[in-house]
Amino acid sequence: MTQDEKRIGTRMAYVNGIAILANFAIIALLIGPDAVGYDTTYGAMTDILQFVAGFSAACVVLVAGKVWDWENNFYFGLMSRIVFVVACIQMLYGVAATATANSVFDSTFNASEIQAMGGATTWFQFVAFGLYGLSLLSVDDGKLPGWGRSVGYGFVVLVLGAQLGSLFGLVPATLFVPIFVLGGVILYPAFIISVGNTISKS
């Protein structure tokens, strides 16, 4: 691993965590959690943050793959490649709604419909990141700090449990929201930052 890769992986881990937190803050505090459809006031901001989150996640996955030797750890290598594709899909849909809303050309779908298409992939994205975290933790040989492993397992258990339960309608909305906040907005950014810290010391 080159020094440039180490620097990029470390910085992008922080960028990813910050983008996730900033996006949630805008949605929760400015747009409102009950809002439906593309928001013409803040939609561009959340779309750009989603694009940044996808790009930074792709960078972290590639560098982390070298740190945890994805070529010799099959399931970790597999999930790394799957999550890289998921991150690309995040980028693909990241600014699509805003681009559609501001397009000078006629479109078959409006911005809200484009946003809904991207949202339809969210369930699998969470599952993919959860399985990626689990595969990384399974091959970690002491590189991650103790707190990083703790928040990592917390994230994995919450996100996979919640997504599996929601698939069959077993998680009520009143419970899903706090699980989402704890797992996706607190534990995930902390875990990805711990990965960045490990990259910087490798």
Where are these regions (language model features)?
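Hydrophobic, aromatic-enriched alpha-helical segments typical of multi-pass transmembrane helices
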Residues: 1-202
